[in-house]
Amino acid sequence: MVQTETDQRMGLNLNLSIYSLPKPLSQFLDEVSRIKDNHSKLSEIDGYVGKLEEERNKIDVFKRELPLCMLLLNEEIVFLCVAIGALKDEARKGLSLMASNGKFDDVERAKPETDKKSWMSSAQLWISNPNSQFRSTNEEEEDRCVSQNPFQTCNYPNQGGVFMPFNRPPPPPPPAPLSLMTPTSEMMMDYSRIEQSHHHHQFNKPSSQSHHIQKKEQRRRWSQELHRKFVDALHRLGGPQVATPKQIRDLMKVDGLTNDEVKSHLQKYRMHIRKHPLHPTKTLSSSDQPGVLERESQSLISLSRSDSPQSPLVARGLFSSNVGHSSEEDEEEEDEEEEKSDGRSSCRNDETKKKRQVLDLEL
């Protein structure tokens, strides 16, 4: 075919030999496998991958209409990229081996003549002790064989090795025997245990009461002299409404006397004044009648038998004829109230314990 001048000017080439027909992937891989040089293999595969990527970019616009074409192109590109990576790894390994060989050759060439002398001396030593060298080499080989052999052998008279028997796992423990007791029977047993503990608590209760009685007996009993000192301190301080337990105790100067004892004695003294007020015409100061303190202490001496320090006294006048009797009644009433309060507290404690036991049974 003859080209015209216009074709030559426009740079048109009508030679069809330049354009080669596309090859299938299997044929391309067969041709690449025949190439011995890794560098040329990589260049061929890179060129083929570039053509596939160009094709994919062209049909990317029509990927919805041509989904299978896109899938095939992507698979071929991924496969060829994996092949390129494998070839590059082989090339790196070859280069590292070549470099190591070159260094070894350089070291061998640079060895001085002194190495030969040391080699000769070591050779003489080796000749002098040949048995020890053989023994050491044999021991090393045996150790290697033992370490490489994953199975352990047993030594028998015939020098034959057999596998070690597998250890059987221990048998599981037998199941616990089933109890024939019903839940109701278990609850009854728990209830009986609770009752036993409750009876035990009741038996121990009198001991606590006796301990409480002993405490009452150990408390202070107020004598006539102690009453006199108490009333004298009240008169000095200005009466029971003004005086404080600490001030009274400091003025009394009695060994072993505490503020609590003086406080309880003062409270009962004030209570007695409220219950039995004296007529103003009959009231006299303690300075007018010197025997007032003696009569006051005698009339209130019976009140010293209560739980806390007591024996209330009138500070500013005389008592009537029934003062001692009324003070004894007050003492009895207070003792009864304390006993009732102790009994109520113990009953409440028992009730709360019973309620807790019932709740535990229900849970």
From Swiss-Prot:
One Gene Ontology term from the biological process aspect of the record: specification of plant organ identity
GO MF terms held by the record: DNA-binding transcription factor activity; transcription cis-regulatory region binding
UniProt region (Disordered), positions on chain: 196-223, 273-363
GO CC entries: cytosol; nucleus
Phenotypic effect of disruption: Increased number of sepals and petals in flowers. Loss of organ boundary and identity, producing fused sepals, petaloid stamens and branching stamens fused along the filament.
Keywords tagged on the record: Cytoplasm, DNA-binding, Flowering, Nucleus, Transcription, Transcription regulation
Protein's cellular compartments: Nucleus; Cytoplasm, Cytosol
Biased composition (Basic and acidic residues): 341-363
Listed Gene3D superfamilies: Homeodomain-like
Cited Pfam families: Myb_DNA-binding
Organism superkingdom: Eukaryota
Main location: nucleus
Comp. bias (Acidic residues): 328-340
Tissues with expression: Expressed in roots, inflorescence apex, floral primordia, stamen primordia, carpel primordia and ovules.
Composition-biased stretches (Low complexity): 298-313
Domain HTH myb-type: 214-274
InterPro entries reported for this sequence: Homeodomain-like_sf, HRS1-like, Myb_dom, Myb_dom_plants, SANT/Myb
Segments of the chain annotated as binding DNA: 245-270
Function: Transcriptional repressor that functions with ULT1 in a pathway which regulates floral meristem homeostasis and organ number in the flower. Binds specifically to the DNA sequence motif 5'-GTAGATTCCT-3' of WUS promoter, and may be involved in direct regulation of WUS expression. Binds specifically to the DNA sequence motif 5'-AAGAATCTTT-3' found in the promoters of AG and the NAC domain genes CUC1, CUC2 and CUC3, and may be involved in direct regulation of these gene expressions.
Complex formation: Interacts with ULT1.
Stated name of the protein: Transcription factor HHO5
Gene name of the encoded protein: HHO5
